[in-house]
Structures are given as structure tokens and as C-alpha cells.
Amino acid sequence: MFDYSIFSKELENLKEQGLYTYIKTLESPQGAWLTINGKKVLNLCSNNYLGFANEERLKKAAIEAIEKWGVGPGAVRTIAGTFSLHNELEKTLAEFKKVEATIFLQSGFVANQAVIPAITNEEDAILSDELNHASIIDGVRLSKAKRYVWKHRDVKDLEEKLKEAKDARRKLIITDGVFSMDGDLAPLPEIVELAEKYNAMVMVDDAHGEGVLGSHGRGIVDHFGLHGRVDIEIGTLSKAFGVLGGYVAGKKELIDYLKQKARPFLFSSPLSPADTAAALEATKILQESDDRVKRLWDNAKYFKEEMKKLGFDTGESETPITPVMLYDAKLSTNFSKELFEEGIFAQSIGYPTVPKGKARIRVMISAVHTKEDLDFALEKFEKVGKKLGVI
């Protein structure tokens, strides 16, 4: 019989290093406040940027979709699993993103694994920022293309790698739009310039930019005014959109090609009618108004400024993502536990999600937080920070 004790030993090692992830179970919907183990806590760690996860319009749309379409698609999309509702979501997303077409998949993670191996192979070169998301890294591995990893946000190093890859059949530059652990932005205008100079494609994973950056939350491409110059945009429907799923946005030819070649599209069922309808409603709300996006930024600005006044190191974030840098993994884990006791749910982030020695509490601000919520958080951060000798 297989000896499972090897896993037990590995788990003990993780605990000793302060790297073991303790999973808390929610007993309430997503929102500014959560109930966990019967305790009401302020939520500072979800990706529910705009509060859509428990938005009445989205819930109503999901319920109506279940009544009309049922609970599941029943097949993959190429056989009998494409509803007109699915097509409507893709059309509306394309209008929102100002692209020719989109294709949605089961998650943002899956979207990266769908597109990268579909458009590259061993004859090609992929140039990837060293801090790109795990889903990009896995997608690159699946493609079998030659990989060139460039220093984080360093366009000079990217150019050197492009020169090294000059003989590749096809060159694909991939970057996160917003880097989820630090909140910094990709230098997308400079990347696009290099891509045009060296005849490369540009792909940006905008999971943390959608609903956050650009007009009405259209994302980093809109933020920099680069419509038509970025070949592939990867989006998620599970963060600012508050639902589930991911999608690829770009030229019609690309999207049509993916519908023939992307394995997760061909061999896995699509989103349920409820998820599809809710995501569609979220897109419509963003098209109508950017009030929530503005509230998100106002909240983030206030919280960051006050945290810096208290003496916390909040890194170099350019977005509502606020890393509270503690560096030591055990300190970060203890800080998170102390915050929870004080009524704040803010998770510690350590290796392998971030490099060793870069542990932090990643604070995720939402449009649904009130000033009173933020002041409560600041009070508790100050208390715990002083108790643990951080400030």
C-alpha cells in the first residue's frame, strides 16, 4: 500500500515554516462583512471589487435564467451546450471591451490554458514576465514553446529576449495587466511598442484590471488607450464581475480559431445558465455607470494614505490592491490571526504565492466598504501592528 505519511511530513514542514494555508469557511454571502465560525468579521481579502457577488440585479438575473434555461448546459458547446444566452454574453462582453469578439470559458485560469497551447507550439517563442500568474506558467508549459522569462516590468530585458527569439516562427509576449500580489501595472504601452517593432503578438491577463481600470472598468487596455494594439485580452468573470468564468477577447479570426482548437472549450461544458445570466447583468451595470468603480478608487486611496501615516509598508501598488509588507512568513501568519481575533479577515500571503522573504497581508478594498468599515480596519491594523512590533 502507498505510504501516505510522506504527505503528512510535507504538511508538517509547511506548518513549521508558516506556509500552511488554513482555509476558513464562510457562513454568509460575499460582502463587506462575513460570518465565519459564527463570528462577524470585516472582509479585506476577497476579489469582490465592486460588490457584485451579492448584488440584487445579478441574483434576480440568475434566478430568472434557471427558470427559463434550467441549471446546467447538458453538453459541451460544440454539441448541444450553447444557449442563445451564452452568445448574448459573448456579444455584450465584446461590446464592453471594444473588441471584435470574445469566447468565454470556465475560469480565467482555464482561459490561459486554452489560448496559449492553441496558438503556439515547439516552433514558437513565448516571452513571459517573471511574476506572471500560475495559469500563464502552466499554459506556457502545455504549449511546448521555447520560454523566455523577462525581469519583472523590465522592457529593456524584454527587448533582449526578443532579439534572442528572432528565429522563432511566432513570438508571443505575455504579461499580467495588474500583478495581483503587489498591485503594480504592466508597462503595456512600452510592451506594445516592442511587439510592433519585433513582429510579436501581445497577450495581457487583465484579471485584476477589469472592473477596476479604464473607463467604466474596461481594463488596462482602455486605461492606456491601446484598443486595437493588444492582440489577446484574458478576462475573468469571478473578481470584479462577482460571478464565475473567464474569457478571451480579440479579433474575430482569433476567436473563431479558438472555437476550433482550444481544448477546454471543446472538451468541457460551459458556464451554467445562472452564472451566464449573472455575468451578463454585471456587464450591463458597468456599461450603464462607473459609480462603483469610482467608489472603489476613493476607498482604496483613503485606506492606503492612512496606512502609510500609521507607518506600514504598503509597497508600490498602483491599484486598490494593498500589500501590507511584513516579509517574514511566521510574522505575517501571526498578524493575520491577530487581526481575525480583532474582527478583521485579512489573509497572510506567503511562499509559493509570493517569493520567500516577501510575505504580506494583502488587503483587498471593495466599493461596498464604508468609511466606517475602513476606519475600523485602520484601528485594528494599528493595534496589531504595535502589539507585534511592526510599527
Curated annotation (Swiss-Prot):
Give GO MF terms, alphabetically. Answer: 8-amino-7-oxononanoate synthase activity; glycine C-acetyltransferase activity; pyridoxal phosphate binding
The record's keywords, sorted A to Z, are: Acyltransferase, Biotin biosynthesis, Pyridoxal phosphate, Transferase
Q: What is the required cofactor set for this protein?
A: pyridoxal 5'-phosphate
**Cysteine disulfide partners in this protein:** none
- Family matches, as Gene3D superfamilies: Aspartate Aminotransferase, domain 1, Type I PLP-dependent aspartate aminotransferase-like (Major domain)
Name the GO terms of the biological process aspect: biotin biosynthetic process
Which InterPro entries does this UniProt record tie to the protein?
Answer: Aminotrans_II_pyridoxalP_BS, Aminotransferase_I/II_large, AON_synthase_class-II, AONS_Archaea/Firmicutes, AONS_Archaea/Proteobacteria, PyrdxlP-dep_Trfase, PyrdxlP-dep_Trfase_major, PyrdxlP-dep_Trfase_small
Q: Which residues carry this modification: N6-(pyridoxal phosphate)lysine?
A: 239
- Reactions mediated catalytically: 6-carboxyhexanoyl-[ACP] + L-alanine + H(+) = (8S)-8-amino-7-oxononanoate + holo-[ACP] + CO2
Q: Which SUPFAM superfamilies match?
A: PLP-dependent transferases (SSF53383)
| Enzyme Commission designation | 2.3.1.47
Q: Which family does it belong to?
A: Belongs to the class-II pyridoxal-phosphate-dependent aminotransferase family. BioF subfamily.
Q: What does this protein do?
A: Catalyzes the decarboxylative condensation of pimeloyl-[acyl-carrier protein] and L-alanine to produce 8-amino-7-oxononanoate (AON), [acyl-carrier protein], and carbon dioxide.
- Under which name does UniProt file this protein? 8-amino-7-oxononanoate synthase
From what organism does this protein derive?
Answer: Thermosipho africanus (strain TCF52B)
